Amino acid sequence: MRLKMYLAIRRAKKYMKEHNHPGRMIVTDKEIEEWRQRTRNMDRDCLTVEENLKKGLNIEKVELPNTSGWLISREGNPEDKVLYHIHGGGFINGCTKMAFFFLSHVVNKWGYNVFSVDYRLAPDHQCIDTITDCEDGYKYLLEHYKPENIILMGESAGGNLVLGLPHKLKDDGLPLPKGIISDSPVVQFVHYPYSYYENSCKTDFGIIFGINEAVLGIYQGDLPVDHPYLSPLCGDLSGYPPVYLDASNKESLRDEARMMYVRLKEEGCDVEYHELKDFFHAQMPNIKSHSTLKEQHPLILSFIHRMWGTNEK
């Protein structure tokens, strides 16, 4: 194991040297402004997506205290159940409109209605703002659904948030959802597990060395690095609802999901973990991928049906 770790570190350092990578993420003011502009452009470009997807779907914008959410439904789907989707994007970009293709697929093909929140993003907002927006979305759902009829679902940064949100709900005395679906989550920012050394700059060029420091620099705010809102792995996981976890064997965050699985098992939680072979990071929303539709989505649907006692279609 030590030899494999040593060789992985050497490979990563060689890649960084060849590509002029400093070995850590340096976030400049120029890059921050570029992120802001990119987010504005994505939001603008997705407006036509919203219009196209209105055909056959009911799309309702919901105003929340500091942001907004979207309820996407279809006639014939169970009216008493909802999947609460929290999008990914590294905490710095992404929006519901970008996820509409995936969400419309869920509503049309999975047969369940979806709510999604446009939480506030770094660098203009920090973790406490983001988790508060996610909680506000959940509070809205509690006005219309029983907690046992709500399942959280998210990928990457969203996978982190669906695991961190129950910590906030427990702190505030709110009922927990029926279940959690977390795809390729980052679960802590305390250290880099082995899969970073093994896969970063080899099979995963998206989640690379230094990303923790970059995210913490613009997203952490005043929270300690091991605060459960930021690092769900580090909190009290007792009493957590059933959890579905997955990650690719080839991604940097693989061991994050493994660690979360072990911690949840230690707490006696109902948890299942699926390691997907040769997948990309956070592949759940990619409905253009054959492997996503044929390998990953059936596993997720099986979990949903088990949670709600519904029949598989």
Predicted regions and their residues:
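A glycine/proline-hinged amphipathic helix-loop "lid/cap" segment
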Residues: M1-E75, G309-K313
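Alpha/beta-hydrolase superfamily serine-hydrolase fold, recognizing
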Residues: V27, E60-W70, R74-K313
